[in-house]
Amino acid sequence: RRRFIAGTAATAAAITAPYVSTSYAAGSLSLGMWDHWVPGGNKIFDQIAQEWAAKEKVDLTIDYLSTQGNKLLLTIAAEAQARAGHDVMDFSAWEPAQYSRQLEPVGDVMKEVLATNGPITEAMQYIGTYTGDWNVVPSTRGSLILPPCSRIDYFKQEAGIDLQAMFPAGKDPAPEAANWTWDTFLVAAEKCHKAGHSFGLPLGATTDSLDWVGSLFSAYGAALVDAKGNITVDTPEVRQVLDYSKRLYAFLPPDVASWDNASNNKWLVSGKGALIFNPPSAWVVAKRDAPDVAEKLWTHAMPKGPKGRFAPLLPRYQGLWNFSKNKSAAKSLLVHINKPDNIRKLVAGAAGYDIPPYQKLLDYKVWDDQGPPPGTLSHYPNRGDQRNVMPCSPAPPPIASQLYTNAIMPKMMVRI
């Protein structure tokens, strides 16, 4: 392994040179990765990582850890406490802030990645730089947003909205997309509800509930805690959201407060629902189990509020434990994984489920090629004026994670 001279020269070299010499065997490296649910999602990552390992003469092992039974979460906690285990781990949501003291700074990695891939979504940076420097590397693999997935026919017949004209396949949103606001959303919810096809919006203590509600709050500039940690519950913006949610709640299925993360998917796939907020997993299930429903689904942008159009983000990251014995090799691998060509392979291998955190890498054809109907996922990645947001931001991550874990926002909406 190449050893750099300490000081400024070392920093400059680290930015431009590989982290691992190809002249010598670089020991072993182990990864604990999220087990991708899309067939092929793990296979393509294996190919990319092992390609690097063969070139750099690294003995690389990859363990794919399921979220079922919290296996991945428990493994992270156990390794952090024992200060032993994998070198690199997969993290999600608020975990990089929770384990910041056990993570190796990776600002040198991110400097190289950003120089190649361009600016990163602010929502990813909000978590990844909580300590001041990057302590994790944002991941394309497993990162997703939860935009609307809607019935084309119900919207056209019952709400008078042509989603395919507003969000055409393979193109940016049409000018009339400016009219797709939360006010329009409320009117459409009422019309579809009266026609027997209510929007499937969960309001329980689940991630799906928190994610769409968080986007609603952001669209109105409402926050329960500000970036400095001050409580900001009693504001006109929060009151406006609560008033809106009271009106919306009347048009939802009566049991949404008890829904789990599968309930909204089932609602849509059953043919009962006109809209849910979800990544393409609901459409994939419909394509398998209810093809007559799948061919009528369209993924498109979030409604716009007074402060903008925000899509809920569920991010993933790779972090390097500060007790790793092969940090140089780990950093080299993280740079390799995040090269544009490899990001493109990851997105294609997951059939478009994964979303790159870099705006300049959102033009892949994989989303336009999905169907039926043709182009149904064209507007899954951000197009136009939509931005990603972490629910409960801009509160400092340790506070935001508690707001999120305790489902404060959806509970407020249910209880008013």
PLM feature spans:
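C-terminal capping/gating helix-and-loop segments adjacent to ligand/active sites or protein-protein/ligand interfaces
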Residues: 140, 374-416
